[in-house]
Amino acid sequence: MGFGDLKSPAGLKVLNEFLADKSYIEGYVPSQADVAVFDALSGAPPADLFHALRWYNHIKSYEKQKSSLPGVKKPLGNYGPVNIEDTTGSTAKDTKEEDDDDDIDLFGSDDEEENEESKRVREERLAQYEAKKSKKPALIAKSSILLDVKPWDDETDMAKLEECVRSIQMEGLVWGASKLVPVGYGIKKLQIQCVVEDDKVGTDVLEENITAFEDFVQSMDVAAFNKI
């Protein structure tokens, strides 16, 4: 598995094709899989690779929360198309904390002569290490929610209904993948994923805002609710 060399145009093209029908590298919410691939990139993909660029900008919005995203960060060879090998040449570390800690050599090389200069360097590194540890963000409680949004009848414009739902923007709310699911008599419901920060967005708030589009929405139900 892999994307080839993610620092090359060919590797970015593979990533773009992989994300053509996906919101995330794995599953329906941002995870350490997204962090592993994001960290392997040299920068934002070019504008013509719009699937990869959309994903890149979305994951970039989690910059301060990367270490708290669910899952375990694995080597790049664990992600991507099964018929392509990873050749990026960098191994993903288990966590953002390890990334930060590995940047700092606390004690220097074994053969470094113990003198005033080496003591000063070591003290500076210890100070940097402590500063980075103190700046790590507090864990934010989040939940992944799958919503069922039902229209009035089979004549309801479902594209407009989804547009209305996604127009709801608030701090602590991120919309994810969606699909239309048949319920009978030609009627389809909108099934849409979202991730919320528990202390900022509740299901009651979502229901109030979604059912406010009463010309399109008959009702809203929570199909699945999982803590992240």
Curated annotation (Swiss-Prot):
Domain of life: Eukaryota
Every GST C-terminal domain range: 2-90
PROSITE patterns reported for this sequence: EF1BD_1, EF1BD_2
GO molecular function, one term: translation elongation factor activity
Region Disordered: start-end pairs: 70-122
Acidic residues bias (residue ranges): 97-116
Record-listed Phosphoserine modification sites: 109
Function field: Catalytic subunit of the guanine nucleotide exchange factor (GEF) (eEF1B subcomplex) of the eukaryotic elongation factor 1 complex (eEF1). Stimulates the exchange of GDP for GTP on elongation factor 1A (eEF1A), probably by displacing GDP from the nucleotide binding pocket in eEF1A.
Similarity section: Belongs to the EF-1-beta/EF-1-delta family.
Identification of the protein by name: Elongation factor 1-beta
Organism of origin: Xenopus tropicalis (Western clawed frog)
